[in-house]
Amino acid sequence: MFGDHPLDNEDYGHIVNAKHFARVRGLIDPDKVVLGGAARESSLKIEPTILDGVAPEDAVMQEEIFGPILPVLTFESLDEAETFITDRPTPLALYIFSRDREVQQRFVRYVPFGGGCVNDTIMHLATSHMGFGGMGASGMGQYHGRESFDTFSHKKSIVNKATWLDVPFRYAPYASWKHKFVRMFVH
């Protein structure tokens, strides 16, 4: 997609600023790079990088990456993979790659995450018709389109009672006829 030299490709994006570049670059363990890994500070670019042999305690697994790094972990079973995810803070996104609909549905239904894709990445961000947002430490609320408006709006519920009418059955003592009368309107 970006050729043999993505750092030279004008269509390949860069990291947002020097501080974030340094943070993301610091997550790359050179001993675990199987693809990419090169970086150019002058243009704030980091090659798409795949890390293999990653352990849960590695730095790259301790925070959200927000960069072109894909850590690969190996699991013996779907149960092990699901437990790995659910035992940690809720991820911002989850990408499931499987042709098996049962596997897809299992992760979509039972694993908490902010948003995601099945057999793709990032595309849930690309439309203003779908909300995007995290849960827990990864943020709350939904952004994009109508969801942004709703998230950043505060809906206030107000009752404005007329002062000229005060119905006495609202107040104690609460006789059984008052309970019956109220239930007619409440239920």
Map each language-model feature to its residues.
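A short beta-alpha structural unit
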Residues: 11-19
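An acidic site on a long C-lobe helix of protein kinase domains
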Residues: 20-23, 77
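PAS and related sensory helical modules
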Residues: 5-9
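Cytochrome P450 C-terminal beta-domain/meander region
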Residues: 41-42
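Conserved C-terminal structural/oligomerization subdomain of aldehyde/semialdehyde dehydrogenase
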Residues: 12, 45-187
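Basic phosphate/pyrophosphate-binding loop/patch that engages nucleotide-derived ligands
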Residues: 22, 26-32
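Gly/Ser/Thr-rich phosphate-binding loop
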Residues: 2
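Short secondary-structure junctions
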Residues: 32-38
